[in-house]
Swiss-Prot record:
This is Uncharacterized gene 10 protein. The lineage of its organism: Viruses, Duplodnaviria, Heunggongvirae, Peploviricota, Herviviricetes. InterPro entries: Herpes_Orf11 (IPR006882). It comes from Saimiriine herpesvirus 2 (strain 11). It comes from the Viruses.
Length: 407
């Protein structure tokens, strides 16, 4: 076994070392030109690389190593691709492990020569879900005065179970006035059930309106939306703030590799013309709960679950409402329906550095020190950043039938 190994798969060379997958075109490629970025289909998936081609140390798959059980894979350009004339890939989180990978390429000539395009797949260790919570807010208006008691909560140590019937408002959200023994100021949703409705949670807000009295406001995705919905919500509660504290409770999910990610769902239908973009604003906001030298924030980018559009990468900072720009890279009008996941946010630790010459869409990985560079910030390896784990790798002996290459 060796610390690194390379193999050719279709038109691509893959090099694996210390959990980092470096990929370059082994042959000339000519992705079709489009108004914003060129879509490139690769002949392999994340799962096929980590399960079918490579063994890592004494385990058959990378995800069985303890260091990778709480991780999120992401795609970044190679450090050398920061030159203005070089093609580069837009950053993307990998949420689909099964289907062949895709990347969006910007810059460079129409025909990309051998090894002209190079990028990396690195596993990031996000800020743990246990270090993220929501806050019980005071009321913002007099809505509670028009509500009748419709639910109750039961408390056991650091857990609360809330049951009741929510009422649909003119704005399309659902509200419920409920009674419960004093709830600590910070909480996390363990489970949410909008019974017999088939609707999916988008956001949840709890406000304290009186002694042991609260209002819960819920936004749900899906249809139809009845006038009333019975809900059951299970919370874990905390007396102290966490690293990140959100105003709303949001539907965090686990990536297939175990890391916490926040899917960003569209709040209204959007139509985007070819080569155009739309800016989408959200009411979500969060704050730092702890004082530390690290700067926690969320890295927002596209996910590989769709090829219809691409999201401009950005850092979502504390006390700043989220706003994202979505591009249509194709030659056709696209329609994105409300409730569709348009982006993924991953909580990381950021560090300031001297501003570089990078364009605002070019996010690069320095393979020498495994750090991610982006304009005036970097993400260092370790907790809240790229995972670096020195271990031996070996190429598995399999009969590989080359899959067709499509652009």
């Amino acid at each position: 076994m060796e610390p690194s190994i390379s193999f050719v798969w279709g038109r691509w060379t893959v090099t694996v070392s210390n959990g980092l997958f470096s990929i370059s075109n082994h042959e000339e490629i000519a992705p079709p030109a489009t108004p914003f970025a060129r879509l490139v289909h690769l002949p392999f998936s994340i799962e096929s690389i980590i399960d079918q081609r490579i063994s890592h140390g004494l385990v058959p798959t990378l995800l069985q190593l303890q260091q990778y059980t709480n991780s999120v894979p992401a795609v970044f350009s190679d450090y050398r691709e920061q030159q203005a004339c070089k093609p580069y890939v837009l950053p993307m989180f990998v949420s689909d492990f099964i289907n062949p990978l895709i990347v969006f390429v910007k810059g460079g000539p129409i025909i990309l020569r051998k090894n002209e395009l190079k990028f990396h797949i690195v596993f990031i260790s996000p800020i743990p879900r246990a270090d993220i919570s929501s806050f019980i807010f005071p009321p913002e208006d007099d809505t509670s005065k028009s509500l009748t008691l419709a639910g109750f909560g039961t408390k056991t140590e650091n857990e609360i179970n809330i049951c009741g019937t929510t009422m649909k408002t003119e704005a399309g959200s659902y509200v419920m006035l409920f009674r419960c023994e004093k709830i600590p100021p910070f909480y996390n949703i363990t489970s949410f059930d909008a019974k017999d409705s088939g609707l999916i949670l988008e956001t949840l807000l709890i406000q304290e309106v009186g002694a042991d009295t609260y209002v819960m406001t819920v936004h749900l995705c899906g249809s139809p939306k009845p006038a009333h919905i019975e809900v059951q919500v299970h919370l874990t509660v905390l007396n102290s703030p966490t690293e990140l504290v959100f105003k709303h409770a949001l539907p965090w999910e686990l990536a297939p590799s175990g890391g916490s990610v926040l899917p960003i769902y569209l709040e209204a239908d959007k139509i985007i013309k070819p080569g155009n973009s739309v800016e989408i604003c959200f009411s979500f906001v969060f704050n730092r709960g702890l004082v530390s030298s690290d700067q926690p924030a969320l890295f927002v980018a596209s996910s590989n679950h769709t090829t219809k559009y691409v999201v401009k990468p950005q850092i979502w900072y504390p006390i700043t409402p989220l706003s994202i720009t979505v591009y249509n890279p194709s030659n056709r009008i696209i329609f994105i329906k409300r409730g569709f996941c348009v982006a993924v946010a991953v909580p990381c630790f950021f560090h300031l550095k001297a501003p570089g010459q990078d364009c605002e869409e070019r996010v690069i990985l320095d393979r020498e020190n495994s750090s991610i560079h982006w304009s005036d910030v970097l993400i260092k390896p370790g907790a809240g950043g790229p995972i670096v784990h020195v271990h031996h790798v070996a190429l598995k002996e399999i009969n590989l039938t080359e899959e067709p290459m499509n652009f």
